[in-house]
């Protein structure tokens, strides 16, 4: 049982409302043992992996700035890391994230009015495939196996996957 008013108590109460929980911070993932931190975080905001005991995946992490190595570890774990302005967000806010539009909206629970509070870009271009695969590593393995099998069968590369692109040079 969690002490009233603590972070874990707040999380438990939000979970009872059956809504997705996002972790939000101004600077995220610095000075931490990132895999341990991601596992602890996803334990509270992720979803159980079917047929894998005591392991979760997914979740949403929003940070004003997310340390690159923490961002990558979140990707590996199947989480959606988003860098966005978090200055208008507070604990317990009900938000709507529109990833393909790059919008975060705050929802007034009384009027159901949605106010856009910030915009963001999904990064990298393969992030949606990574989430569907349950993580970046799963995607890389699945894409590689698919390519090898299709090659053996003398088929073209699959167009199902978003392929990574190299950044443009200035």
Model-derived features: where do they sit?
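Long, charged alpha-helical interface segments
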Residues: 94-96, 100-169
